[in-house]
Amino acid sequence: MLTVDSQHCFSFILLCFFSLLCYSLLFKKLKDSHVGRDLLQSPPSLPIIGHLHHLLSSLAHKSLQQLSSKYGPLLHLSIFNFPVVLVSSASVAYEIFKAHDLNISSRDNPPINESLLVGSSVFVGAPYGDYWKFMKKLLVTKLLGPQALERSRSIRADELERFYRSLLDKAMKKESVEIGKEATKLSINSICRMSMGRSFSEESGEAERVRGLVTELDGLTKKVLLVNILRWPLEKLRISLFKKEIMYVSNSFDELLERIIVEREKKPNEHQGTYLMDVLLEAYEDEKAEHKITRNHIKSLFVELLLGGTDTSAQTIQWTMAELINNRNVLKRLREEIDSVVGETRLIQEKDLPKLPYLQSVVKEGLRLHPPLPLMVRTFQRSCEMKGFYIAEKTTLVVNAYAVMRDPTTWEDPDEFKPERFLRQEEERRALKHIAFGSGRRGCPGSNLATIFIGTAIGTMVQCFDLSIKGDKVKMDEVGGLNLTMAHPLECILVPRTQPFISNQQIPSL
């Protein structure tokens, strides 16, 4: 016999089923109004849920790539009858970002985000408008633009030296090194010192806690993005699914960042607008500011910087080093270039990067094969036509960057690690189809900084160490997540090959 709780559960499932069925019939009637217009091809789907099972795959980018390989590079999918346009080829993606950039410059900010990232005041997910433009301008002028990057170059040099010394210490002790973890330390310390003039302490455990929160947030964000697909009538259910996790991560970041903000407010004249944090606090306190922001705006932005500016770079460094270890001929050529340009008496520097075209090509190739965000999601704000097909207003756009950058019609041997492709003029023109950091107005504003992090970190390891692993090849399996993550973290034994001159200047403590 069913218990009362079981009866309630069964009744709820029936209610959801019939609600979805009724909604499907209603949507079908609305869709009939577009009869006579050319609609995109749609692969076979399942009743009620449509193509949801492809997005719920642990490796959704590969599942969608296989779907496009079979049915075409431009497809119409349905998730509970909500329309989705899937793009999986370089030529189609290029056309969309060129012809429809403004129309797809916004993202939906669903209710489940209200309690995520210390409030709904996010920058990355904000609609394209005054607030988004204001925050992007601050990011560019104070952190990510060419002049800002030049001002903070010495900070990154300090952190790169610290990164090298940490690796050297482990090498001398013959300890294995988890490349992703060390790269994450480099990225987090650099971003924090560049944006707020301080880093997190290793001795107190503060740094380890922040890295743990970033990892938790990455996994949680993936869950939230997937459950956001379950729109009406399951809104209340989807909000409650991860409420406990959301509140824990959000409250933890809120506590951490509130403490930092209070510290800054006690010393208002110490930095005088030097760092992004100070400029944001000035705007927060200024009643006549160009755009009024709240404390949650400030906290949300720094959470996004930690998530988007650290884990993505660290994962790319790890993936690219794995490719170099598995392709020793490429590693040999790269080392020869670095030795000839930089030498053995000093550590590689940012100023060397323009003189190292093969290193730049290695970075591009690593990003091509392993884009940090394999799926890019936007929303068509208005109805339009694309390649002669009708696209309804509020249709979700999914650009499979993973598939785009392995498109065999654009890239020769698309699944092979061949950095030299970017040295050839013809392939350099094809690099316009390289969308590892997105494209258009909503492209990643931190792409230049990420390229610097990745290039100097890889350059340091190749210049200074021989790398060995257990077995002949690094396992290149992926694991599901917001970012493209290695299922088996790359661990190496490092053997010093050169010990370039390191200044006697004391590096700030972690």
From Swiss-Prot:
Keywords: Heme, Iron, Membrane, Metal-binding, Monooxygenase, Oxidoreductase, Transmembrane, Transmembrane helix. Pfam families: p450 (PF00067). Its EC number is 1.14.-.-. Coiled coil: none annotated. The chain crosses the membrane at residues 7-27. InterPro entries: Cyt_P450, Cyt_P450_CS, Cyt_P450_E_grp-I, Cyt_P450_sf, Plant_metabolite_P450s. Gene3D superfamilies: Cytochrome P450 (1.10.630.10). PROSITE patterns: CYTOCHROME_P450. It is found in: Membrane. One of its GO terms (molecular function) is oxidoreductase activity, acting on paired donors, with incorporation or reduction of molecular oxygen. It is a single-pass membrane protein. One of its GO terms (cellular component) is membrane. Signal peptide: none annotated. Its cofactor is heme. Belongs to the cytochrome P450 family. This is Cytochrome P450 705A20. The gene is CYP705A20.
